[in-house]
């Protein structure tokens, strides 16, 4: 993960957290020598939160709204580090689809044709229901095809890794010989 960004604005706090911080400070003032464990303190705090009036809760909710507005304002002005996405090697073999995805590909057009106003999500849910109600005999061709594709993928992956190791080895050898000269 690395270091946290020190300039990033602090996240907004809920009304309950504002209440809890206030309750803790009051409790320490009233009973400075008393120690409460986290579990016991949380229990007392939640009991108190449930017992206070809506009027009192409104004060904490207003504080939470102000804090939320502050956070949103600071985030609009904040320009953080952009995380670089690791680029995928275009020569690397792609993972094969599962038996369900193969089934979905075959039935997508039919479902979309029957229900043209459905979104992709709705079609996918319907395909999932169809898959779960399909018997094993109908699933078998998809599972066999997926197994073949998976075996082919593992072979390609092994060849790709060996090829990458070969490139690294050649690079190291050429670097060593250039250093000797």
UniProtKB/Swiss-Prot annotation:
Q: Which UniProt keywords apply?
A: Chromosome, DNA-binding, Nucleus, Repeat
Give the protein's recorded name.
High mobility group protein B4
- Cite a single GO MF annotation: DNA binding
UniProt keyword DNA-binding, yes or no: yes
Keyword DNA-binding attached: yes
Found, by tissue, as follows: Expressed in adult germ cells (at protein level).
Q: Which residues bind DNA?
A: 9-79, 93-161
Species, as recorded: Mus musculus (Mouse)
Which SUPFAM superfamilies does the entry link to? HMG-box
Similarity section:
Belongs to the HMGB family.
């Amino acid at each position: 993960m690395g270091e946290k960004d020190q300039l990033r604005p602090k996240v907004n706090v809920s009304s309950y957290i504002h209440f809890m911080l206030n309750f803790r400070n009051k409790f320490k003032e009233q009973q400075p020598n008393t120690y409460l464990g986290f579990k016991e303190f949380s229990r007392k705090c939640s009991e108190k939160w449930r017992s206070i009036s809506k009027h009192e809760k409104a004060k904490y909710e207003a504080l939470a709204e102000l804090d939320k507005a502050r956070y949103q304002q600071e985030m609009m002005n904040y320009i953080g580090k952009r995380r670089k996405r690791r680029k995928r090697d275009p020569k690397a073999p792609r993972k094969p689809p599962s038996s369900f995805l193969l089934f979905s590909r075959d039935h997508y057009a039919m479902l979309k044709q029957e229900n043209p106003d459905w979104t992709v999500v709705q079609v996918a849910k319907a395909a999932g229901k169809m898959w779960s109600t399909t018997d094993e005999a109908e699933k078998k061709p998809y599972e066999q095809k997926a197994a073949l594709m998976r075996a082919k993928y593992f072979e390609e992956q092994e060849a790709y890794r060996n090829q990458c190791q070969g490139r690294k080895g050649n690079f190291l050898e050429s670097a060593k010989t250039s250093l000797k000269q």
